[in-house]
Amino acid sequence: MPDYTAYQKSISNELISIKDRVRNFIDDRHWGEDGRYKEIILSHALRQHLPESVSVGTGFVVNNNSLTKQIDIIVYRNDFPLMFKQDDFIIAPSESVLGIIEVKSKITAQVGEKAIRNATENGRIIGRNIFNGIFAFESQNECFNNPCLRNELANSAGIVNHLCFGADIFLKYWETSYPRINPCTQDSYAVYQIEKLAFGYFISNLIEDIHIALHGQQLPNALNRMFYPIEGTKEAHKKADIAVVER
């Protein structure tokens, strides 16, 4: 019987191992500044798991006459022409974009507020319901409880929809109409403590969203079991709900 929990934890272990290997060459003074390394590490992991019909880049997204801020990771369809491409740097029309991710070395309340604000604005410019995530390799202790960060997330109201605060904390936006165990009474972000599984669940949710966007159907059962191996679902590991502000 496959051990899918161990497999998902191995994704976290692999990302942490590569991060630490690079960190051996870069002292603490420069580690926080040099975000590009972390983007490359995560981009490489995504390419290993995403279907060949999509690509991963970095750059900007254009919708009508509006331009996003620079986005760390853009997942886009290969069957759309790009406006510009040079190696991994792209300028993409919004219609081609399936997901965007902001990558952070370590989430603190202040860093999280700014990241959520920027990702929300980029999501509004793109103007479509896509995977919009924030991925942090490390997290300050329970920074998701900070009132200012929670307020920024509540105001995003689902535009930012997946967040990973280190290897153990995963946040996902849920609408009340979605059937699940122990739901909040209004649209909200659920905060889950899932040891060594947050990285894997973040990537799994991205893959699932892209599969649905491309094929209009849910994941096959075998993939669903592999991507979400927590027995009894992750709802048993929910720590909190953050209710959203009505848009």
Where are each of the predicted segments found?
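Intrinsically disordered, low-complexity Ser/Thr/Pro/Gly-rich regulatory segments
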Residues: 1-70, 75-247
